[in-house]
Amino acid sequence: MVDSLIDFYLQSNGVTLFVLALLAVYFIALNWVFYYRYFSLNSWASKESDSLEALLMGSANVASDAYLSHFIKTSSTLNKELFDLGMYAATKEATKGLSLLSVVASTAPFIGLFGTVVSILDTFDNIGGASGTMNIIAAGVSDALIATAAGIFVAIFAYTYHQILKRKSFEVSGLIRMQRDALLSKSGHGA
């Protein structure tokens, strides 16, 4: 296994290795963003869920660590505009990192394809300089396709992570929206 990796490294085009290194950096970054945001959103959703539960059990106001509490403290009256501002700010905060995952999901296959094209061009150049047997062609194309496979691999994770975080963000926004509606109905302003 290690010998195969060393052979691949020694025989591959520099651009292909650069593409694989770039995709590795992409993969590390998207995993960091995903796990950081996932655990942050989980913690946030738990706080909002507890605050909503307290409201539904008769509490007059949201919990002090609930997102809307910051907006409620700044105003003497509860109104829809104040809560709309809070909802917008919460949605913006909850969706942080999604654009990075989206960019990685859409660009990773193209980066891999770029490495493949350059590697295939290098293979054709080597075929022109030597007697091109089928073994030389197959080996060159095989090495070239590794970059595309790596790009698709990274994109699959980025897209999956994007969808998971998008759903978690929607959950947090929904919990905040329910708190807003409960507060407005208690104050007589309606939702």
Description of each model-found segment:
Residues 39-133, 160-191:
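Predominantly long cytosolic amphipathic alpha-helical stalk/bundle segments
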Residues 8-50:
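Transmembrane alpha-helix/interfacial motif
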Residues 22-32, 111-114, 118-121, 155, ...:
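Alpha-helical transmembrane segments
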Residues 13, 31, 109-112, 141, ...:
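Residue-level signature of catalytic and energy-coupling elements of molecular machines
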Residues 6-13, 91-105, 138-146:
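Alpha-helical membrane-interface segments at transmembrane helix boundaries
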